[in-house]
Amino acid sequence: MGEQQQQVERQPDLPPGFRFHPTDEEIITFYLAPKVVDSRGFCVAAIGEVDLNKCEPWDLPGKAKMNGEKEWYFYCQKDRKYPTGMRTNRATEAGYWKATGKDKEIFRDHHMLIGMKKTLVFYKGRAPKGDKTNWVMHEYRLADASPPPPPSSAEPPRQDDWAVCRIFHKSSGIKKPVPVAPHQVPAAANYQQQQQMAMASAGIIQVPMQMQMPSMSDQLQMLDDFSTTASLSLMAPPSYSTLPAGFPLQINSGAHPQQFVGNPSMYYHQQQQMDMAGGGFVVSEPSSLVVSPQDAADQNNNAADISSMACNMDAAIWKY
């Protein structure tokens, strides 16, 4: 029953929706300065007293006067390593608090220095090989740089012996991937869909066209069917220009130049050409690919003459 009564007394009576979240200037002006002036008589319902050297950071939320918050406030006294020194003992049983960054100056009305804020991070283990954690502490103290009094002095403790500490656990800061909406479509597909909708609204019917390549059996059938002029026109040989009847072919072999006349019947030619007049065209008839016996004999004679001359010459130069 006594523990429940103490728990009720520890909880401040705040209206729903209110949170204890003072600014840096408010912490120095309304909570730290009065505590330094009257350390025994001044007490705040939202801030308790704790010895940070005897508590681990994960145990501090249970010792706070305000539960259910993401940050916790405490009054603490500095434990100096040496009576006449400025260094503070920040070690606990499981680790130590290490200062990081530069101290921040706290001003009143943007021109009067009233306090300092130091940021510390808790490390597990012993320095300098401790493991960094996400526990962070902001230590607020008054702006007083006077040296500490000697141990035998009867003067009151210094102003910076007391501090307000704000403890919180920093999140890891891992960003979650942004999910892609299932209704999103690429820009090209969206544009094509808009074009189809526009054509449908205008009454235009789009019929897909499919081109088919002729199969091998169709090509063989066209070769066999010589009676169809259109089919033969697809397989017609290319047109070659025939040489004139008296076109000489001269071979220089030293002092005995020789020439012979080419036979126009040696070259393929078509009997008729395509007529493009009148906006149309006429498919030419298939040309004959058969060589007469007389032409074949002339070709053999010419080939024999060329072979005999090529064997006897040392350096032949062909002139057309």
Swiss-Prot record:
Name the domain of life: Eukaryota
What's in the GO CC field?
endoplasmic reticulum; nucleus
Tissue specificity, in the record's words, reads: Expressed in developing seeds. Expressed in developing endosperm.
- Which positions does the record tag as DNA-binding? 114-176
What do mutants without this gene show? No visible phenotype under normal growth conditions. The double mutant nac20 and nac26 exhibit a floury grain phenotype due to decreased starch and storage protein content.
User: Where is this protein found?
Assistant: Nucleus; Endoplasmic reticulum
- Where does the record place the NAC domain? 14-170
InterPro entries on file: NAC-dom (IPR003441), NAC_dom_sf (IPR036093)
State the UniProt keywords alphabetically.
DNA-binding, Endoplasmic reticulum, Nucleus, Transcription, Transcription regulation
Q: Output the Gene Ontology terms for molecular function.
A: DNA binding; protein homodimerization activity
**Comment, domains:** The NAC domain includes a DNA binding domain and a dimerization domain.
Q: Assembly and partners?
A: Forms homodimers. Forms heterodimers with NAC26.
What is this protein called in UniProt?
A: NAC domain-containing protein 20
What organism does this protein naturally occur in?
Answer: Oryza sativa subsp. japonica (Rice)
